[in-house]
A protein has these predicted regions:
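N-terminal hydrophobic or amphipathic segments with adjacent small-residue motifs
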Residues: 17-20, 88, 127
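Membrane-insertion modules used to breach or fuse lipid bilayers
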Residues: 53-116
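Membrane pore-forming effector domains from diverse proteins
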Residues: 96-155
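Deployable pore-forming modules of oligomeric membrane-permeabilizing proteins
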Residues: 1-70, 136-171
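Hydrophobic alpha-helical membrane segments, chiefly transmembrane helices and signal peptide h-regions
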Residues: 75-81, 127-131, 135-136, 160
Length: 173
């Protein structure tokens, strides 16, 4: 699922600082960095299981992961030091960005409580942060200046699971 296609969207992270912002002061000529701007945060579903509770009491819902899933850090342009970019994003937004996130085989999803008379889907996948990046260089006059073209970043933040609940249909026989 691409961003914007029936994805569940989440609030964007707040910037913690203006480090590397083009036009701001820097201290060492020749230093390089990247200025990152968050654009979208969404749930990338990788798997789901339908669940229904036709009983009169709430019930716990769990699922065992049957396929290993992996989400990796992706950049639309060749960038020197993707690991360094992950560190910059961690410092900018306060979340820990890593190269990849996994759902492991036989890992448990849940438990979630499914109310009586309800149905739904237990869905799991990853929270993805879409961002734009711009490499910068510290000029001799101690100002961050754009270097190269802007690029797109798709960074996994964490594994995510949720129980999406609907009203269970009642059939008359």
């Amino acid at each position: 699922m691409a961003p914007g296609e029936d994805a569940i969207h989440f609030e964007l992270p707040q910037r913690w600082n203006d480090d590397y912002k083009p036009g701001t002061a820097c201290s060492t000529p020749g230093d390089t960095g990247a200025y990152v701007t968050a654009r979208d945060r969404w749930f990338k579903q990788t798997d789901a299981a339908s669940v229904a509770n036709h009983d009169s009491v709430d019930m716990p819902v769990t699922q065992t992961v049957t396929q290993t899933r992996e989400q990796t850090f992706k950049v639309s342009a060749k960038v020197k030091g993707e690991g360094e970019l992950a560190k910059i994003m961690t410092n900018t937004f306060g979340f820990t960005y890593v190269h990849e996130v996994h759902w492991k085989l036989n890992q448990k999803v849940g438990p979630y409580t499914l109310p009586a008379g309800q149905q739904g889907r237990l869905a799991w996948g990853f929270i993805i942060l879409e961002a734009e990046g711009q490499n910068v260089r510290c000029t001799p006059d101690l100002v961050w200046k754009q270097s190269g073209k802007p690029y797109h970043i798709s960074a996994p933040e964490t594994k995510y699971a949720e129980l999406q609940i609907d009203q269970a249909p009642h059939y008359n026989n």
